[in-house]
Amino acid sequence: MAIVGEVTGALGLLGKAWAWLRDRFDPARVQAKRLIQAFEAYGTARQQIPRLLPAGLALPNAAFSSPDKLKAHLSPALLDWAAEHLAIDRSWLDGVGAQPHRIEEHYKSPGGYRDWLAQRIEQVPHASRLLQVWKMHGSEIGPDAYGPVCLVYEEISEGLDGSEFSRYWRLSGEWPLDHSPCVENMIALVAIARSLGVLVAGHELALGDLRRLTAGKALIPELQQRRRGGWHPEDLIEPLPGQDTAWRQARWQGAQTYLKQAGIDGATVLGTPLDAGAASS
């Protein structure tokens, strides 16, 4: 049995080495593989992709059955369309960029978040929206919090056959929870989202999964399936009765300082409660 295990392990390593070499010397296959991978991660089966294509890019279903078949049909226009449809980074589809998701980060400049979110609302007025605040599972928010926090914007519109289709943007890098300015900027963004009518929800992931997200090693919808729990970021703006702390007050005060620098009155977000529990469901 030991010999069988060693042989199986060796074959597995050889298979990985062959796959790496094949991708290394066949960049068109990498593009095709990533295009199919991305659509499937976003909930669109490969045989459904042709239904989404504009008339000028029409392809038969069989073209999407495998990366090897699709690579012969690739064109810059097809890849441009796929990147725009999924809101993913075009250079990642090319196998060049390290990050699959577009990143819209305005650390210490919350006015940039306000302007960008307002623009998304204007451009896609009928979508549902959700600001997700992802932190490490098991790390309670407070003075002893540790691990990274990552902010994700989700835009939900109508998909095929009455289904929902989501696009995602990363709104932060890997912000450490033990660094007060990062917590305060996170709270400021929660306040801005709330003032614009964007639902807010907190999710928890294993540390390894959070690191895969920030390193660009996993797609957001893939990690959505690996959530370990939830929490309520809006409690950092308006805590539940009897649960306020001096630490929370200091962080909210710091967040209001960043908001004021951007010409935003932090008090305007109070009294505009959103159903974060519904957003988490």
Task: Place the predicted regions along the sequence by residue.
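DNA major-groove recognition helix of helix-turn-helix/homeodomain DNA-binding modules
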Residues: 76-92
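Long, charge-rich C-terminal accessory regions
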Residues: 117-264
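Short, cationic, amphipathic peptide segments
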Residues: 1-25
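The short coil/loop that forms the "turn" connecting the two helices of the helix-turn-helix
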Residues: 44, 58-59, 88
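Short basic helix-loop element that most often maps to the first helix and adjoining turn
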Residues: 28-54
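Charged, alpha-helical interface segments at or near domain boundaries
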Residues: 81-85, 103-107, 117-122
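Short amphipathic recognition helices of helix-turn-helix/homeodomain-type DNA-binding modules
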Residues: 89-110
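Recognition helix of helix-turn-helix/homeodomain-like DNA-binding domains
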Residues: 54-74, 83
